[in-house]
Amino acid sequence: MSSRYRVEYHLKSHRKDGFIDWIKGLLAAPFVLHAVSHDGDDNDELATTQRVRSQYAEIFKDIESLVSDKILFDERNDQYRQYIESNDVEEVIPLGQPRLDLLVPTIGTFFTQLPLEKAFLWEDARKAISSRRMVAPSFNDIRHILNTAQVFHFIKQRKLKSKDQLRMCTFDGDVTLYEDGGSIVNTNPVIPLLVKLLSEGVCIGIVTAAGYDEAKTYESRLNGLITALNGSDLPYAKKRNLCVMGGESNYLFRYYEDGESFGFEAIDKEGWLLPRMCTWSQDDLTQTLDFAEKTLYRLKKRLNLPEEAIIMRKARAVGIVPGHFKDPETGNMVKIQLDREQLEEVVLTLQNSLEGFAPAQRIQYSCFDGGSDVWCDIGGKDLGVRALQHYYDPENPIKPSQTLHVGDQFAPVGSANDFKARLAGCTLWISSPKETVEYLRRLIHDE
């Protein structure tokens, strides 16, 4: 019963990724055709595995070609669109769509080529995907293959000393650099990897939903990293390439050292806000947060959420967070837990309600489920990443093809705030801080 429930839950439309599901469907045919028993005959097993591996690899090679075709097609469309805008053309001739858009209508933008065949063979050598007869290639298998392909691309660009080498790497905080609700302590294995990236001239941005207008909280959560950075022999200019973008795109802090003191200093909004963000009126921002707050109070009552659940209003965000209650047996304060279904009902209803609210349509906002709470932030991670791209190099902004965002929340609808980062750069979809470390080691050391 519980197993079936879990499967059905993960098939909900807002939890699926169209591209990964499509690839799973393509791989299902060779898996089903070769899911046979050879009664212990090692030669037949080996032959079947080789045949399955070959067919899987061919599928990924074909997808690789479709991605390349889409990149070229999108570039041509962008050039045509710019030509129309600059020449005031009245008659617009549609150029059509790349084939991948027709096959996967929800597909996003690819900023780089992806060596998917090579990535599959590498993952298959480690995990023996082709040798499985009872378990088909899974969502996680494909997620890892896509991640590995992206890493291989940047390794190749570094070796070629290409103009599209990695220039900026951004990270989510919780579940990416540290466990949910945790912090970077001195023993965190990600620290030397981040310092290594900085030493190679790569800018580092921590783009987090945690929104605070002062630096102390970020200094506390990232203490292990900034302590290591302060004690390193990196040139100060490279140390300064560590920034925190708080509230997704609302507060920017940059690393500094001044004598014995070090930490993060706040950067004035005039120095980094994108032009489109400057056009948002304060009235629209306030009305959007007011509306979201009223919606949360209404949902708290309708869903009979615990009284201890707190609706918290900030300057640029509003959310519902779990409170605490006193355990009658132990006398200790215990954190309440909101059910997964309650969190998703709240975030999806909030998103749907705001979509029909006029002031919200004149700005950008982001509704997401943080795992134990739900928030509505002004802005979004795509804006946070883009702001950093321009802030680090105003004269020659970092391109999406030179940007890598690492995060754990990429579900396409409602509950995931890393999803929008796909609009601003390449991405790695990880599920734990351990995976972040593994991919960074591979990226840096070509392991």
UniProtKB/Swiss-Prot annotation:
Keywords: ATP-binding, Hydrolase, Magnesium, Metal-binding, Nucleotide metabolism, Nucleotide-binding. One of its GO terms (molecular function) is IMP 5'-nucleotidase activity. Transmembrane segments: none annotated. It catalyses: IMP + H2O = inosine + phosphate. GO terms for biological process: inosine salvage; nicotinamide riboside biosynthetic process; nicotinic acid riboside biosynthetic process; nucleotide metabolic process. Mg(2+) binds at D172, D174, D408. Its EC number is 3.1.3.99. Its cofactor is Mg(2+). Allosterically activated by ATP. ATP binding is a prerequisite to magnesium and substrate binding. ATP binds to 2 of the subunits in the homotetramer inducing a closure of these 2 subunits and the release of the C-terminal loop, thereby activating the enzyme. Homotetramer. Belongs to the ISN1 family. This is IMP-specific 5'-nucleotidase 1. It comes from Candida glabrata (strain ATCC 2001 / BCRC 20586 / JCM 3761 / NBRC 0622 / NRRL Y-65 / CBS 138).
